[in-house]
Every structure is written in C-alpha cells, then in structure tokens.
C-alpha cells in the first residue's frame, strides 16, 4: 500500500493539464463532444463517470445517497493514476464526495512472471471453476493474496491449500459431526449441557471471532480474516481429537453430545463468516445443520433440530 500511496502522490506533483478529447480522425468510436463534433471523449474520462451514474447520480437521489460515497474503491495498481488523480479531480469539480478510501491491489503472477498472452502463461479462472468449483477458487484467491502486494499462482499451491484448509479442516469436521449425530442421536442435534473448561474455551474464542474478523475486513486484510477463521476451525478439530466423542459416546452420551453441539456451533459460525467468500458451499453446510438464521453470535445452533443429509463439502483432490 505504501508504494501505491507514494506513486499516487508523485503523480499529483508532476501532473500537467489532461486532454480529455481525441480527434475522430484518430478514433472513430467514442462519445462525441457536445461542443465539437470533430472530437470524441477520452475513454478514461467517460468511463470513470460510470462509477456514480450506475448508482443513481443525477437520476435517483435516494439510491445515490445509499451507495455513494464508496467505502472502498478497489482498483488494480496499474490504473492507480487514473483513479487516484484524474477521478478525484473530476469529483471535486462536480462537487461530488470522494470515495472514503482508494485501495490498489497487486497482480497475480504465474510463478514469478506477470501473466501475458504472449508468454502463454495466463491462467483461465473459468477452467479452474469448471474443474474445482467457484467457491474454492474464490477462497484461494482471497486467502493467498495480501491485498496491496503481488501474489503467485501455481496449480500445486491451489491444490495444497484446497486439501489442507477446505477438505481436511473444514469439510472433514462437518463430516465427522454430522456422521456421529446421525449414528448416535437419531440425526438430532444434542443438548449442549453443562460446559467443561475445554468447551468454554471454544465458546470464548467463538464469541470473539466475529469482531476480530470484521476488523481485519475493515483494514482490507482479507487473508488474515480468513486465516483467523481457519485457525478457529483447526482448534475445533484439535478439540474433537482430544475429546474423542466417538469413544466417549459409549459411556457418556451426554458428554459426547455436548462436544458435538460445540463443534457444530463452531462450524455454523465459521460458515456464516466465510459465506461472503464461499456462498454456495457454506449454504450447503448451513442447510446440513438445518440453520436458517445468519447470525455472528455464539449459541444460535438449536438443540433438538434434525440435521439433513449432504454431499461431501470439499472432496479431496488427488
């Protein structure tokens, strides 16, 4: 971000008058200038206006008030001058509020190289979506990139992240919890009962999770927000291993039920927090737990609710 800020300020100091027209002799297409039919508008000038007209500027004042000014204007670092110099100048001159923040993100590289058609190293996201689904692709892109920096894509790192985070940690936890509930509790979510110290530790972390994640998102640290959620899920997997409800249920059914309720509630909370990134797979998880309410608080999972059958959430990639 510091590099982008420096570039933006540097461009302000060295910037001269900007020509916003192009002669039709050079450019046949474009919006004709109302005061000179021999010229059209420079594309970056008329294109920028779409940011405000699309949300109702000069058309719907209520809609415009709702959506503008933007909290964040997220752009690529290669078009920083256009958005950090030209665009604010246009808004100032029109008496329109500026975006509250302009954030320039980096590039996705193939290995160490910038993606280029001439080099033949372009990764087609539609091919990834076809093979692995849109939610895992969205998860990987959000998790791997530190916004503001460049990031490197390899199919090997994608598969490793998918199997580690999604298949092993998240998907496997759902499978364990729902399988044990179906087998030992007739498919009905058990009562949480009196919480042990370990249960209370998970609950305390769950109660603090939403605030931490929201702060990371506000700071545009999306990778850290996701990692915070996944650390919580990994902690719940460890909690399951330490308590072994599949063994405990033989002698202490209430105790095993308490553990499964806690793990199920952790899954619910994790799914709600990850739903903006993986709306489809998290909906599958919430449907499996028969949860309809999207709530960031702890204790929303209803004991006595019958869970539903579901396909494997994230089948491992071999």
Model-predicted segments: where are they?
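Single conserved hydrophobic/aromatic residue that forms the stacking wall/gate
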Residues: 2-13
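Active-site and channel-lining beta-strand-loop segments
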Residues: 24-33, 40-41, 89, 98-120
């Amino acid at each position: 971000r510091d590099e982008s800020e420096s570039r933006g300020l540097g461009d302000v100091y060295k910037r001269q008058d900007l020509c916003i027209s192009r002669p039709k002799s050079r450019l046949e297409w474009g919006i004709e200038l109302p005061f000179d039919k021999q010229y059209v508008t420079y594309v970056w000038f008329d294109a920028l206006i779409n940011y405000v007209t699309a949300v109702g500027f000069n058309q719907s004042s209520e809609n415009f008030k709702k959506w503008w000014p933007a909290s964040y204007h997220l752009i690529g670092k290669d078009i920083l001058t256009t958005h950090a110099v030209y665009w604010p100048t246009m808004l100032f001159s029109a008496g329109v509020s500026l975006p509250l923040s302009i954030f320039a993100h980096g590039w996705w590289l193939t290995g160490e190289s910038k993606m280029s058609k001439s080099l033949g190293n372009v990764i087609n996201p539609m091919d990834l979506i076809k093979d692995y689904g849109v939610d895992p692709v969205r998860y990987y892109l959000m998790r791997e990139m530190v916004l503001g920096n460049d990031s490197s894509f390899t199919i090997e790192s994608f598969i490793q992240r998918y199997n580690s985070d999604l298949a092993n940690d998240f998907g496997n936890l759902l499978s364990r919890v729902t399988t044990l509930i179906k087998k030992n509790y007739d498919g009905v979510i058990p009562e949480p009962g009196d919480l042990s110290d370990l249960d209370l530790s998970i609950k305390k972390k769950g109660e603090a999770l939403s605030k931490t994640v929201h702060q990371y998102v506000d700071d545009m640290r999306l990778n850290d927000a996701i990692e915070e959620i996944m650390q919580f899920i990994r902690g719940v997997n460890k909690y399951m291993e330490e308590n072994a409800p599949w063994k405990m249920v033989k002698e202490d059914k209430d105790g095993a039920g308490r553990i499964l309720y806690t793990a199920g509630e952790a899954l619910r909370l994790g799914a709600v927090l990850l739903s903006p990134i993986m709306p489809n797979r998290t909906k599958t998880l919430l449907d499996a737990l028969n949860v309809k309410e999207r709530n960031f608080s702890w204790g929303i999972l209803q004991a006595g609710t019958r869970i539903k059958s579901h396909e494997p959430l994230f089948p491992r990639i071999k």
